[in-house]
Amino acid sequence: MAKKSPLQKFLIVTSTFLGLFAIAVLIASPLAKYFLEKYDQYLFGREVTIERAYVNIFTGYVSLHNVKMSEAKSDTIFLSSVSIHANINRYKLFWREVEISRLTFEKPWVKFTQNKREFNIDDLIERFTPNKSPNSSSSWNVEFIGIKIAEGELHFIDKVIPIKYFIKEVTIEALGKLDEGDTIATRFNFLSGIGTGEMKGYFTVNTKSLDYHYDVVVEDYDLDIIRQYIWELINYGMFRAHLNANVKVRGNFNSQESMSGSGRLALNDFHFGKTTTNDYAAFEKLELVVEELNPAKKKYLFDSIVLTRPFFKYEIYDSLDNIARLFGKRGSNITDVTRQVGRFNLVIEVVRYVKVLSNNFFRSNFKINRLEIKDGNFKFNDYSLSDKFSIEGLPISLVADSVNKSDQRVKVVIRAGIQPYGKGSIQLSINPKDSADFDMDYRFEKIPVSIFNPYLLTYTSFPLDRGTIELNGKWNVREGMIQSSNHVVIIDPRVSKRAKNKDMMWLPMPLIMALVREQGNVIDYEIPITGNLNNPKFHWRDAVFDLLKNIFVKPPTTPYRLEVRKLESEIEESLTLKWEMRQSTLDKGQVKFLKKIDAFLKSNSNAVMTVNPVTYAEKEKEQILFFETKKKYFMLTQPQASKLLSLQDSMKVEKMSVKDSSLVRLLSKNISDTVMFSIQEKCVNFVGSKIVAERLDQLIKKRSVLFISYFKEDGTDKQIKMHESANDIPYNGFSHFKLGYEEGIPEAVRDAYHQLNDLNKRSIRKKYKKYRNAGPLVAN
């Protein structure tokens, strides 16, 4: 065999090496794919599938396509990615170290799952956490330098609460070495997966000291995740809100108070309540502009805090109220969660954190350049009475300029309109260094006493159909000790007919009114309050002396008071025709009055009377609803009763309580909605709203026909202009016909006006003239 030349040997060795190298290059990629899939359990503790792999053995570049990783001990997908690529330091592999740089996930889909304290990534964290034990020589250390997620979608599931939430178009780029002692800098940007919104920013954290810093911009971010956490705390209800923010914060994870932040934060379109259309609390916008917030240094410096169009509704039912219905009696739903050690609820944690941040607010250096509440609305409904009581503060405003601890006093002005009638104002002068040191002036005026008829009916059986409430006072509080004067005036209160129903208690209101009412037909009392803010003392001496004075001094003025009352009644009856609830017939006095009007029109052929029916539809509907409910129940429980109730049966139904235990059980048994708490809702469910609307229409038409019938005999009905019925809340609390005279006023009415004006000039009534101007003599 011929001896090979050195050149031949070189060529053979080189070609062999190149051939083996070429084979290695060619098989490296499929070999890597095979190796990762074959030893996936050893490497990751999970099953991994890869559609295609590319490995560059010269540069250490690795690219994997269509990667899927399952959950531990499951075939459920945990992660999938269109592409995963990175650079691996080849030389460190010889020292059992895997250094991965520029690890990039293209369009990944990841599902994070929490079950109590366990997460579905716990095994991965444990596997890839570097082993710092000096005795460890067998394990591999894995180190990451820079990680990027591009256009990802991250899902989070809490199996206990439960929570299902995700974010999309996620871009996260972590720069630097992910190892102890290094600062990790991260840029992020993502969209809300549910609803609208974007969040982007920059975040750094020192993994050794746990110092952090972040700049975050949030644009119209849907807080649906809050809704899901709230559902764990409530029995029913809906929530929605959007967040806008631009904030910069520094701090340390070891101390909640060691943070310093500034920027702008706004909650928009906040709604929380029974349903998506029935709010208990809401506001259009809450905006905070923070100059510096640093609890550790006791700095709370705000440029402005502005709450726009807040709404709050508080309701009392026969059992509990709307707050207790939401969160359980005494907040039992919340305590059930907070008592569980290690239980996480985002809402509770946020509240706890805010409490920590604001704990020392009044003992700190605080400043609010502008504090304002605009166009507020507070509504109170009481369904526990025989009739529904409702009152509303709208609009409510609060303005406080320059709330600064360095100032001696801070002035706060609160103004409120009271619906359906009235207004109020409160002026406060507060020592910013001591909240128990303040002065207060308040005034509430033009409030019709008929608003409170549901309470009067429930506890006395007597409503009031006339009267205006005025309330004012001054408080001076120093170190928590009160010195105050409180003045209440009720102008021209008048007791109406007694209502008879088993829901109502009875008190002799006409007698009580005779005792408490003073000579000028007013109730006028001063009630000083002293003592401590935590234990105020009411002084009734003035009220008692006035009561005795009314008993012994008022009788000589009785003729005068009777004359005034007669004239007021004559004027009122000439200008209005009052209808009791569900009344469709006229009493003797009303018939007599209509005959007088008929005679006046007959003798004054040019006179024209206008009639404007005003229907208190809300109350009329409520009373019709109660009657129809009791009637249907009576028919069901009295098989012998005919479909047309007799007069005796009607009286039984009328006096029956709509809150009779047997009736309530029947109503509750047939409810179609588990969040029907008021007797009114249950009655509507029982009889339907259609029949109530029909009965009201029939009642309105019947009243108009009945009224006109008294003028047809003499042909004076042609001198009457009957307008369409208007739905309103009357000042006197009753439906009525408002009467007007186009061609002259009846002489008797004119004379009565003149006489009443003369009587009002007397000293007994003159001092209350300004109050009488606050409320109409007759209903609007």
What are these regions (language model features)?
Residues 21-116, 144, 172, 177-179, ...:
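Terminal hydrophobic membrane-targeting helix
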Residues 66-174, 274-395, 492-510, 533-547:
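Secondary-structure transition motifs
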Residues 126-160, 182-191, 198, 252, ...:
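Solvent-exposed beta-strand/coil patches in large extracellular/periplasmic or lumenal scaffold regions
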Residues 40, 64, 84, 103, ...:
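Buried hydrophobic packing residues in well-ordered domains
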Residues 204, 217-219, 266-268, 308, ...:
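Outer-membrane beta-barrel pore domains and translocons
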Residues 45-47, 74-88, 100, 161-173, ...:
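Amphipathic hydrophobic-ligand
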Residues 2-14, 293-298, 303, 359-366, ...:
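Extended terminal
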